[in-house]
Amino acid sequence: MKYSVELACDSSKAWLDTVMDDFGSFLQDHADCERKASAMAMSFVAKYPNRKEIIPELIETAIEELEHFQQVYNLMERKGIALPSEMQKDVYMQQLMALTHGGTPDTRFRDRLLMASIVECRGCERFKLVSEHIEDEELSRFYKVLWASEAKHGNIFVKMALKYFENKEVYDRLDELIQKEAEIVSALPLRPALH
């Protein structure tokens, strides 16, 4: 059974150049994304306490994402970069989450799991790009470790969806959402941020 997600488009060189030109801002945004990823995993636990089969993995994922936040924060501290007092709205996430609205509570649950998978896989793809192109050796090593972890998270959410929904339903909807994500990511304004 296939758990991995293949994105429909690659991140652009223009996005990578924008990040490399203002890496401090990228780190600030990255820290915020890790904090939100931890909160998202726990929000599944809060909203779906009856889905007992996946709660242990969700808690483990939330803890791991919080550890990533701590690692990014520690790295920022060493480099003299403060957490921002206010973060910009994440247009990417807003547009993706809009795709999960409507339908039944079950289909919303399914779509939220699949969307979490796609977001983790986009993070993985972008962390890999950063690790391969940044000249700072410490940052290169850090992002190499992170992209491997994010790939695992992407797989976890597909696996969770398959516990509750038929294979065809999961993969058909996943394909639809992957195509929509490609349209969204291709139209995003360039900024030194993960999304």
Go through the PLM ranges and name each one:
Residues 1-195:
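Non-heme di-metal
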